[in-house]
Regions:
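Short S/T/G/P-rich N-terminal loop/turn motif that feeds into the first structured element of a domain
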Residues: 1-50, 57-67, 81-100
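A common structural junction motif
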Residues: 72-74
């Protein structure tokens, strides 16, 4: 299992609009092969920054998604919200203890 974690800073005061757009765009991708779930989290100390995380069955499924038309459409929609740098990490999940 792998997790994709992206940190980014948004335009000042744009979080609510970004979150609405994120929810709308990613609701289209719920059936992406290998996708186990997503989280969007806002920094408690800096309301204009946060993380988007997605959990994947394997790296191949994640890479296929990152090359897809859906991913390109989503990124084109979300990119205007970002200012400055954003960074993405791909990590292998070593331990899980999720409670529903």
């Amino acid at each position: 299992m792998v997790i994709r974690i992206t940190w980014g800073r948004l335009r000042a005061g744009a979080w609510s609009e970004f979150e609405r757009t994120y929810r709308a765009k990613f609701s289209e991708g719920k059936t992406v092969k290998g996708l186990r779930g997503r989280l969007l989290v806002q920094d408690t100390a800096d309301k204009d920054a946060g993380f988007a995380m997605s959990l994947w069955e394997n790296l191949a499924d994640l890479e296929t998604y990152e090359q897809s038309e859906l991913y390109q459409e989503v990124m084109a929609t979300l990119q205007p919200f970002f200012v400055g740098e954003y960074k993405t990490y791909r990590c292998e999940v070593k331990c899980t203890d999720l409670v529903s």
